[in-house]
Amino acid sequence: MYLLVDVGNTHSVFSITEDGKTFRRWRLSTGVFQTEDELFSHLHPLLGDTMREIKGIGVASVVPTQNTVIERFSQKYFHISPIWVKAKDGCVKWNVKNPSEVGADRVANVVAFVKEYGKNGIIIDMGTATTVDLVVNGSYEGGAILPGLFMMVHSLFRGTAKLPLVEVKPADFVVGKDTEENIRLGVVNGSVYALEGIIGRMKEVYGDLPVVLTGGQSKIVKDMIKHEIFDEDLTIKGVYHFCFGD
């Protein structure tokens, strides 16, 4: 049994699998565990006796301050050194200026895509930030980063005197008739339009590539963005393939 961890800025996903095909997963707020013992106190009730079966731990983290917690947790409770996801040559080539700057979550997504769906495609991951990644002939060619949906609404709320904090959901109208509708239209629908523009330009240059959609906020716009594949476990699958796959 393997423990797979995706440490994000807002939430962290913990998943267990035997074969990299079926996954059980749990989502925790990243800020709730500041020590290895706090992390154990949250995970032990969820994993139960399964913890005794863990023989490997793989981690994709974009929060460096949590890496020490994960390392100590792995050593103290499993006597295992975790394997960390990072860009390196293997099943994927990294055709960017500084591969070490590519976030571990994006590395995991690209590895999972190449392993499971093919060597050509576009990956949209909607989390705290929204990322777009391009894979051509098994080579990671780069991508784009946008603010995430919740980041946008919180930014408007915190950065202004009067704008409210609104529910993040799609707008089914062309123009907003009150402040809340204006924000929803600008944030949610505006993000979709931006993604469509980025994807459209990539397809003009690289061909009609399939699009895979993933990420904790992707369900909000799932019916608005044209995509061929929806895979909410893409990042976790990538952690498995990178750390324990062939």
UniProtKB/Swiss-Prot annotation:
Record InterPro entries: ATPase_NBD (IPR043129), Type_III_PanK (IPR004619)
Protein keywords: ATP-binding, Coenzyme A biosynthesis, Cytoplasm, Kinase, Metal-binding, Nucleotide-binding, Potassium, Transferase
GO cellular component: cytoplasm
Residue numbers binding K(+): 125
Pathway: Cofactor biosynthesis; coenzyme A biosynthesis; CoA from (R)-pantothenate: step 1/5
Coiled coil: none
Residues at the catalytic site: 105 (proton acceptor)
Cofactor note: A monovalent cation. Ammonium or potassium.
Compartments it resides in: Cytoplasm
Predominant subcellular localization, coarse grouping: cytoplasm
Binding site for ATP: 6-13, 128
SUPFAM superfamilies for the chain: Actin-like ATPase domain (SSF53067)
EC number from the UniProt entry: 2.7.1.33
Family: Belongs to the type III pantothenate kinase family.
Job of this protein: Catalyzes the phosphorylation of pantothenate (Pan), the first step in CoA biosynthesis.
HAMAP family: Pantothen_kinase_3
Name the record gives this protein: Type III pantothenate kinase
Organism in which the protein naturally occurs: Thermotoga sp. (strain RQ2)
Organism ancestry: Bacteria, Thermotogati, Thermotogota, Thermotogae, Thermotogales
